[in-house]
Amino acid sequence: PSQVLYFLGAMMAGVVPVLLHEYLKEEDIAALLRERPIGGFLSDTCFDGLKMQPAGELWQMTGKETGADADFGVLTSGTSGLAKVLFRKEASWRDFFPVQNDIFHIDSHAVLYLSGSMAFTGNLNMLMAFLYAGGTIAGTEAVQPKTWMKDIGETQATHVYMIPSKLSALCRVRGKASSVTHILTGSQLMTKRILDALTRHFPMSRTILYYGASELSYVSYIEGKDILTHPSAVGRPFPGISIIIRDGEIYVDTPFAVDGAERPLTCHDMGRVDEEGMLYFLGRREDQYHIKGNHVSRQKVLSHLLMLPGVEEAEVIGEKQANGDDRLIAFLSGQVSASDARLMSLLAGRLRAWEIPHRILRVASIPKTSTGKTDRKRLLAMVKAVSLG
């Protein structure tokens, strides 16, 4: 709650607030300052190496001018994993709230439950959308699924907002909440196991998966069983949003983007739109592999891996070969009882021959970086360790 109070208080005082992740190290903040100057920090941590001057109990000033004609800033990790600040006008969110609240069925009777820091753009936006509608907000920063389930029941939450990996953890604990009518999620692909488990835990709910970015806000959404019947699809555009595909890249024309954004804008995600207007997210350009003269989308392969029985998490990486081709290695976690041969057979019914991974490795969990992204270096190390063994 204190994050939100300070954020709103700073805006009312005419300051341009930016919420930072608590896990950011001093060197990360130094890199952030080089990229986009920030005038001061409200923090209970002293950053000795950044040469800032105390300006009150919690304030530390950098002596720099932000130079942004904006109302607030949001963070994005970008392609490098390093935090970057993007600036927004209040209207870029406020004017879209009626649209997203209609799609997500948010009104003054809705009760939101969410988990994590408000420095995550999705959390902050969803919280502000509920405030705009006059709804009720509950949540915690604790990573404790048992606490989540208990809180959801006690608060009679109608909406749960979490990324799929958190929903997966939530569904592994006991409990049922019939008050929940909507599960809102994005940023990652869903699995059949998670969707089935959500139905058991929240029998009155429907799931809405969205695609968006800090730069763009919401772009498209897909609901319920369509998530299963259209692997790698991220739905149709929100009202007022246009999607254009240029050379395989997704371009979005939206009036609700960050300050200074071109129209249309691309985040360099790859995709396609089918004849029904459904957008398929195929990953980033650097996530395209080359196998026997064919381009293979990591996202497409990953979406089908996640639909295999018993899979909780999955990842796929390309191992470069001497001839320049990539060899796909799949990683699966969960209670996957089927043999590798059976899994390969299931994939053969859904993927082309060159899209099927060369090898499947079963792991306890998919390693993550501090920002929650897959740690591909550790996955490559696992491959080398298995090869040497």
Can you name each region flagged by the protein language model?
Residues H268-E355:
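AMP-binding/adenylate-forming catalytic core of the ANL superfamily
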Residues C46-D71, D95-F97:
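Flexible, low-complexity linker/hinge segments
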Residues P1-Y23, S115-S117, H295:
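Conserved AMP-binding/adenylate-forming
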Residues L189, D196, L209-Y210, S220-R263:
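Adenylate-forming AMP-binding core of the ANL superfamily, especially NRPS adenylation
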Residues D71-P98:
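Conserved AMP-binding A3 loop
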